[in-house]
Design a protein with these regions (language model features):
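Short hydrophobic alpha-helical segments enriched in small aliphatic residues
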Residues: 8-10, 14-17
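Juxta-kinase regulatory segment immediately upstream of eukaryotic protein kinase catalytic domains
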Residues: 29-61
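ATP-binding pocket architecture of kinase catalytic cores
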Residues: 65-224, 228-241, 256-259
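Catalytic-loop of the protein kinase fold
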Residues: 241-243, 248
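Activation of the activation-loop gatekeeper triad in protein kinase-fold domains
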Residues: 265-270
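Active-site activation/catalytic loop segments of kinase-like enzymes and analogous catalytic loops
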Residues: 277-322, 336-353
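Helical subdomain adjoining the active site within ATP-dependent kinase catalytic cores
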Residues: 324-328, 339-393
Length: 393
């Protein structure tokens, strides 16, 4: 596939990346940039005696004691590593403080993984769910521990030596999304995860409502973006399983192969609906269009570096693998940017109201403004279509 320096809007690639739900997993010997677990952060401790009582009778060996560590860097849900009788488990719970309605629904993520895992092996298996908030103060669940690494700022040296490593990971990443969207939602019963009819309309309205509830500053440009998304909704292709947060740092890669995806993580927003909404959000993270208002706030994206798929290559491989018409992908990219802005605004709203003391969130207001400016500039840009490819599905 030919390389290209332009995105779906005909503008240069962005050098900007937001990471607000990241996790790092590794075994010994990997780069310090991919640290595994560490001590539990102050203020995020769990009630170990209460947890131990709950585990007894559910996990063999729990009566002999448990050890607890934490996966670093997450900006929303909290993720811990449990060791019980020599076996590792992952515990997931929602964030501290008040959260937006329907956000960070650990019970739903547990049930989604229960349904998806048998049909998409990259989704981790889950074991136990507690909806009794008296145990840890929030709903939580246990799932299997998978080993691998998540790429962020650079490729570890032992992998960088592999021929064409970045290109091969790019291919595997796109192909994994293609497989996810190929799961038969009718035969597997996954259609029960959502209501495909009216998916885009509900997405725009639902995220607009979340924005209104979390607003801290007036942003007329966001009102314009919401109106544009409401008035320009394209016809959706046939519905599929939708991850709703598919990005490089939500995918666990093999430590010794460029072609193998060990796990896809963070399924709390998964549903069934328009697969191009997934693709649009993924493209927002992959390599963004250049925007002056973001230059001072961003950092170079790993996928903007030499060897990685360009956005054109990414879109073309997806089109060839699915046969879907991507001529309206520009709409879905604006939708993705809009959703990212709302997610960050919800986190910033919690910080402004003192519901979290995490200082990592103090500059999220500036990031939100940059995203809104980017979305607003894109809806006014004349080239909004990608060439038609494949057959409409």
């Amino acid at each position: 596939m030919p390389a290209s320096s332009e995105c779906a809007f005909g503008m240069p690639h962005v050098l900007f990346e937001l990471t607000f739900r990241g996790r790092h997993f590794r075994r010994k010997g990997l780069s310090r940039l991919h640290l595994d677990t560490g001590p539990v952060r102050p203020g995020e401790e769990l009630n170990l005696p209460s947890l131990a009582d709950w585990l007894r009778g559910r996990i063999a060996g729990a009566e002999r004691g448990i050890t607890l560590e934490q996966f670093p860097s997450g900006h929303s849900n909290l993720t811990y590593l449990l060791r019980i009788d020599g076996i590792e488990y992952v515990l997931r719970r929602g964030p501290l403080g008040l959260v937006a309605p329907k956000a960070h629904d650990m019970g739903r993520e547990f049930r989604v993984l229960q349904m998806v895992h048998p049909h998409f092996q990259e989704a981790p298996n889950v074991f136990h769910l507690s909806e009794d908030t008296a145990v840890l103060g929030a709903v939580f669940f246990l799932m299997e521990r998978r080993h691998g690494l998540i790429l962020r700022d650079e490729i570890p040296p032992h992998l960088a030596k592999m021929p064409n490593y970045a290109e091969r990971v790019s291919k595997a990443f796109v192909d994994c999304l293609i497989r996810l969207h190929a799961v038969d939602i009718s035969r597997t019963g996954l259609i029960a995860l959502g209501k495909p009819e009216g998916f885009l309309e509900r997405q725009v309205q639902g995220w607009a409502d979340r924005w209104k509830r979390a607003t801290t500053d007036d942003m007329p440009k966001m009102d314009r973006v919401i109106r544009w998304l409401t008035d320009h909704q394209p016809s959706s292709p046939a519905p599929t399983l939708v991850h709703n947060d598919y990005k490089l740092d939500n995918v666990m890669l093999s430590q010794d192969s460029a072609e193998r995806i060990e796990a896809v993580l963070d399924w709390e927003m998964a549903t069934v609906g328009d697969p191009l909404a997934d693709l649009g959000l993924t493209l927002c993270y992959w390599a963004w269009v250049e925007a002056p208002q973001l230059r001072a706030r961003g950092v170079p994206s790993l996928t903007s570096q030499p060897g990685w798929y360009t956005r054109d290559q990414f879109v073309r491989r997806y089109a060839e693998g699915t046969g879907r018409d991507l001529s309206q992908i520009g709409y879905y990219e604006v939708l993705g940017i809009f959703k990212l802005a709302v997610i960050l605004q919800q986190i910033y709203y919690r910080f402004r109201r003192g519901q979290t003391q995490d200082t990592r969130f103090q500059n999220f207001g500036d990031r939100v403004k940059g995203l809104v400016e980017l979305a607003d500039s894109l809806i006014q840009y004349p080239k909004m279509e990608y060439p038609k490819m494949g057959k409409s599905t």
